[in-house]
Amino acid sequence: MSIISHINPKENWAIQSNEDHSNGVAKLCSKFASEFGMGTFGKIAGLLHDKGKEKKAFQQHIKRESGLEPHIKVDGDYSHAYVGALIAKQLYPQIHPFLSTQIIGHHRGLYNYTAFECEMSKHEIPSDVTVPDATDTSLMRSELQKLRRDLKGKDFHHLQRMLYSCLVDADFLDTEAFMDRQSASLRQSNITLDELYPKLHTFLENIKRKAPDTAVNRIRDKVQQRCIATSSGPKGFYSLTVPTGGGKTLSSLLWAILHAKEHGMKRIIIAIPYTSIIVQTASVLKSIFGEENVLENHSNVDPESIKNEVLLQKMRMASENWDYPIVVTTNVQLFESMMSNKPSKCRRLHNIVNSVIILDEAQTLPIDFLQPIVDTLKTYQKCFGTSVLFTTASQPVLSGVIKGCNPKAHFEGINHIEEIIPEEYQLHDQLRRVK
């Protein structure tokens, strides 16, 4: 009899074998992790993550909890996440932290290193679990070696979270596909940024055609032309410093979508400090692209504003992992996810890979957390292929190194931020004169 991974009472007690589930998770996890060069790690993590379900106690537990055999006795400890972690450590002793930390925490969250070591030391591999042979060791070493050329010590915890994100989302998605096929069917492929660009182009052309020939509109057009001209630049850090009234929202969106098209990037994530601005920005985006193509993920989302029940369900599901072409969220949601250890928040991280991040009103980034925020953005740009666009009316100092007499005053910024609007444009003076 095959090892049970899931039982679906709604489908006449259908059983998903642990082999099918593990293979499904491995396939998805490998696909996600391949985006940043660690596909083999994703595959092995997926194959090992539920090895503990082979335990006799777990098989009894799942039969009882599902209702298949409600009166069956459970003999002993039925926890399972630690088993795959111990197997990973045994099979891959030198590189196991990039597997075992994700596996042992795939339900309860990532442990810090001390707690991880303590938890691992409490257990042994159960005798009723089969330990497979080690495979793909050389491939994993090669993947890690390529990344290590650019990694610094502070980058590794983000790499751990990213691998964790791949495993957690893959586990959720494969389980959902078996337990709730109707919901899973809503996760069909979304429209791409390439397909969305004509909508933006048409919208901007209509505005231009109807707009009177005024000084303000000429400045806005000038800003947009600069965004078009610089959008083909390499992935990296950019800033768009445009005073209020200069058309910053549409210009930044134009730059982001063209930059994404240039580099084959998958999505645009717009992070905004205030929910009032988010609602306004999202409304503009929906008028351009359609509400079905813009995901709002913040506390002020009004479900009643979405009349289509199917679309509402799709949006709720997409907010779990940000698998959407355009995401509008808060700074808090973005940075809490990047620095969290919880499955629900980390789940979306792998969908930030190869994305354009627009940080609106960059001057509002909290001073007390500015160093870890900047360090995180540098890691995501270097290791995970993102580009970051800071937009503001008055750009804060985020580049270079600032040294003070107090250690807390020391700030290591971004080496280079490419300003889209040259100083000679003097937009502040021009807009001040025409108001």
Model-predicted regions and their roles:
Residues I15, H21, L28, T40, ...:
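Conserved pre-motif I regulatory segment
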Residues S394-K435:
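Interdomain hinge/linker at the junction between the two RecA-like core domains of SF2 helicases
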Residues S251, A256-L258, G264-F289, E296-V301, ...:
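Conserved Walker A/P-loop ATP-binding site and its immediately adjacent core
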Residues I103, P234-H259:
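Walker A/P-loop
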Residues G233-L240, K266-R267, D323-Y324, R432:
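Pre-Walker A (Motif I) flank of P-loop NTPase domains
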Residues S2-F203:
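Accessory nucleic-acid engagement/destabilization modules that flank
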Residues G290-M339:
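Inter-Walker segment of RecA-like/P-loop motor cores
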Residues V327, N331-F335, P343-C383, V388:
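SF2 helicase catalytic motif II
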